[in-house]
Structure formats: structure tokens, C-alpha cells
Amino acid sequence: MTHQTHAYHMVNPSPWPLTGALSALLMTSGLIMWFHFNSTALLTLGLTTNMLTMYQWWRDVIRESTFQGHHTPAVQKGLRYGMILFIISEVLFFTGFFWAFYHSSLAPTPELGGCWPPTGIHPLNPLEVPLLNTSVLLASGVSITWAHHSLMEGNRYHMLQALFITIALGVYFTLLQASEYYEAPFTISDGVYGSTFFVATGFHGLHVIIGSTFLIVCFFRQLKFHFTSSHHFGFEAAAWYWHFVDVVWLFLYMSIYWWGS
């Protein structure tokens, strides 16, 4: 290893951005094949290569940060800026979905019956499963904060306990959302109501699955003593992401489930 006189991490050439891009192409193409031709072969290949890429890329980052010491305070500062910008881009991503929803619902056209929800649509009761989902995500926000404070205080047992509770609540939310989709009296093809409902809540559900995966990785890393009270940005980024998912759900609940019903 050559000596360096600066605090920045000079990353070695890596195949993972290329394999990640190829797996994303396979997944999106596979999704189209599944929708139009009922074939899941390409989608399965894309998901498999994506999972392998994520595993090996994260493995390399963990090696560089935890075992090789490349994540100096200057590098961590850059990672924090990167995570903040990523979350801002996600906020703008969801802004598009809310824009589509309010554009359609605030001034419903004659084709929709001049009312919202459109004629013939029976919306879900916001005081049933959606309210339970809201309480589950809010509880998970409390438990992830508990985990963060426990880590800052050096209490490993409480950190693992709180993190496990957060993951369990995230999985429970996903199962509730899946059951709600299964029992919904409308589909994604039921006009603009169905499309805005399923795209907005579906992408949020995808983000919950991504966040849960992020937290599961943190849980296993903490089992191996990877985090300390002063060096734990991987967990901190996961906590920021989880709080973002919480806040988006509150807006979804108030807009689509409560006001939109």
C-alpha cells in the first residue's frame, strides 16, 4: 500500500457499478416482459444479479471502512452530504407522485364523474389497515431512535434489541400492505385513482423493503462489533432513510387514504 498525504479515499477500480447497471437494465426489461408476456425469466435473472451486486459491493465498502480504515472524518463528511442529496432526490421523486394525485383529485374531469374518488371506486377505509400501518411505522421511528441513542451510549444489547424491533415492524408493515393490496376492491388499471394509489403506495412499500434490508445489514454488522459510538455512519444513514420513509408515509396517509377517500 502506498503512503498518502491526504485524508481522502482513492477508490480502486470496481466492477460493481457496471454489474449494477446491467442488473437494473435486466430488472426493468424483465418487469416489462412480466407485464406484457407473463414471463418472469428475465426479471428473476435481474433480481439475482442485483442481489449479488449489492452483497459484493456492500462487502467491499465494509472492508474499506471497518478493516482498512479508509473512512476518515473527511470521507465520512462526504458520505453524509451524499446521503442527504440522495434523500432530497427521493423527496423530489415522491413529489411527482403527489403532484399526479392532486392534479387529478383537486379538479376531477367529467370522465371521472366530476367527483373524487371517481364514480364506481370504493376507497379503502382509512381507519382500518392504513391507520394500523401508520401506528406501526411511527412505532418503528421510535425504536430506531432508541437504537441510535443506545449506540451513542455504548449499550450494544439495547441497540440490537431496538434494531430488531424496528426490522420486525418494517416486515409487519410490508405484510399488512401486501394483504391490503390483495383485498383492495380496485386495481392499478381502474383509471387514474387506481394508478396513482398503487404507484405511490407501491413505491413507498418498495422503499420500506429497501430500508428494512439496510437495517438488516446493520443488525448483522453490529453482531460482529462493526459499530462504535464514534464510528457508525452506515447505521446513521439507515436511520435517516428510515425516518424519511416514515415522513413520506404520513403524507401518503393524509393525502391518499384520509383526504382522498
UniProtKB/Swiss-Prot annotation:
EC number of the protein: 7.1.1.9
List the GO molecular function terms. cytochrome-c oxidase activity
The processes (GO biological process) annotated in the record are: mitochondrial electron transport, cytochrome c to oxygen; respiratory chain complex IV assembly
List the transmembrane segments.
16-34, 41-66, 73-105, 129-152, 156-183, 191-223, 233-256
Please give the organism: Ovis aries (Sheep)
Any Pfam family hit: COX3
Question: Which residues lie toward the Mitochondrial intermembrane compartment?
Answer: 35-40, 106-128, 184-190, 257-261
Q: How does it sit in the membrane?
A: Multi-pass membrane protein
Q: What is its main location?
A: mitochondrion
**What name is this protein filed under?**
Cytochrome c oxidase subunit 3
**Known catalytic reactions:** 4 Fe(II)-[cytochrome c] + O2 + 8 H(+)(in) = 4 Fe(III)-[cytochrome c] + 2 H2O + 4 H(+)(out)
